[in-house]
Amino acid sequence: MCVPSTPQPPVIGRFAPSPTGPLHVGSLVAAVASYAMARRQGGLWLVRMEDLDTPRVVPGMADDILRTLECLGFDWDGDIMRQSRRADAYGAALQRLLAAGHAYPCGCSRAEIARAATAPHDGDGEIPYPNLCRRGLPPGKEPRSFRVRVPAEPVEFTDLVMGPQHHDLPAMCGDFVIKRADGLFAYQLAVVVDDEAQGVTQVVRGADLLSSTPRQIVLQRLLGFDTPVYAHVPLVTGPGGGKLSKRDNALSLAAGRDLTREGGMLLLAALRFLGQSPPAELAGASGARVLRWAAGNFEPSAIPTAAAPFHASP
C-alpha cells in the first residue's frame, strides 16, 4: 500500500526594514539573502515595515525603501505589513503574558537599574535587569514599562549560518522590556507577534540581530507560537571597519546611482559578499535577471560568518 507523503508547508521568508533612513548595502545583503533563501525553495517573500519606533521614522522613507526595492528588481508577495498600525495585536499579546504571569509592570528608570546592578555587563550599553520589580512594584512606585520573565535555563538553537547557539538570558539581559516607558511596544514583542500573524517560517537577517533571537524564542514559547528557522548573515563593515550605519552615506544604495541601470551590479556584489559565485555572463544583467539566478542557485552553506567590507565591483 502506497502511503501519500505529507505535503511540506511552504517556506515563508520576510524582509523587514526600518524606515529610519535609506537602504544601504548592509540592508541589500539582508534583502538578497532572505529573498534567495525563500525563493530557492519555492517559498513566499514578504516585506514588512518596522516603523514601530515612530520618533525615529523619517517621513516618506517607507515609500522610498519600497521604490528602491522595485528598482532593484525585487518582487514580494501580499500586502506590506506596517507595525505602526498593529498596536491592538501587540496589546493583546501583552495582556496574554500578564494574565499568565509571564510579564509584569516595572517602575524602574535606567538610572535606578544602573545603580542597582551588581553583575558585570558586556559593555554594549545593556545592563542585566536586577529584578527590582519582579516580585511586584515596591511601595510608591508607578509602572513605567512592562517586562517579560526570562527562564533560568539557557536558550539553545541552531542558526543556519552561525551554527549552534547557547544564550544565558539572565546574564545577558535579564527580564527584558516588552512595552516601553514612552508607551511604545518593544521591537522584541512586535516582531514575534508579526511573524506569527504572517506565518513566517524562516527569518534571514543581519548578525547584529543574533542576540535578539533568544529573546524572541522565549516570547514565542510563552505565547504558544511556532519558532521559525533563523539564519544570520555577516555584517557589512563601514569605512572605519565597524558596523555599517545609515549615516554612512557613501554606502547608501541611492548615493549617486541609477538603480535601474546599476541594480544588477549591486545585486551581484551582494551575492559575492554572501559567498556565492554568479556566472560572468550576468555582468550587465538587470536586477530582475540576477535575482532569478539567485533564486535557482543560491547556496546557504557558502555564506561566510565574518563581517567584511562591501565591494561593488568584482
From Swiss-Prot:
The family database entries (Gene3D superfamilies) matched by this protein are listed as: HUPs (3.40.50.620)
The cofactor note from the UniProt entry for this protein is: Binds 1 zinc ion per subunit.
Q: Does the keyword Aminoacyl-tRNA synthetase belong to this entry?
A: yes
Motif position, 'KMSKS' region: 243-247
Name the GO terms of the biological process aspect.
glutamyl-tRNA aminoacylation; tRNA modification
The job of this chain, per UniProt, is described as: Catalyzes the tRNA-independent activation of glutamate in presence of ATP and the subsequent transfer of glutamate onto a tRNA(Asp). Glutamate is transferred on the 2-amino-5-(4,5-dihydroxy-2-cyclopenten-1-yl) moiety of the queuosine in the wobble position of the QUC anticodon.
Q: What's the protein called, per UniProt? A: Glutamyl-Q tRNA(Asp) synthetase
Q: Which organism is it from?
A: Geobacter sulfurreducens (strain ATCC 51573 / DSM 12127 / PCA)
